[in-house]
């Protein structure tokens, strides 16, 4: 798909009736901050310039770019996590 990371997360949350900003940096301040140790499926995992949705068991789903589309990744800590946000 042509979705970028924040467009993907905005789309998923909109499906559940939750409106969030369409820019990754703005998504860092929505909802309630929780620690990564307390992350639950559906939480936003925010990185520098990127955002993903936590699936549980250390896994995320995110838009990786036009070459890859929407992908699951089994290592949420593959880069430094800026914040974890809970909206649900």
Role assignments for model-derived ranges:
Residues 18-37, 49, 55-88:
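Aromatic- and glycine-rich peptidoglycan recognition patches
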Residues 1-24:
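Secreted/periplasmic proteins that engage bacterial cell-wall peptidoglycan
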Residues 1, 37-38:
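Residue "hotspots" at secondary-structure boundaries inside conserved domains
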């Amino acid at each position: 798909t042509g979705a970028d990371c924040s467009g993907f997360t905005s789309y998923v949350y909109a499906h559940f009736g939750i409106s969030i900003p369409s820019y990754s940096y703005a998504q860092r301040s929505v909802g309630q901050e929780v620690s990564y140790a307390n992350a639950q499926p559906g939480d936003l995992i925010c990185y520098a310039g990127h955002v993903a949705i936590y699936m549980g068991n250390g896994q995320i789903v995110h838009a990786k770019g036009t070459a890859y589309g929407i992908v699951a990744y089994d290592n949420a800590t593959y880069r430094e996590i800026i914040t974890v946000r809970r909206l649900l």
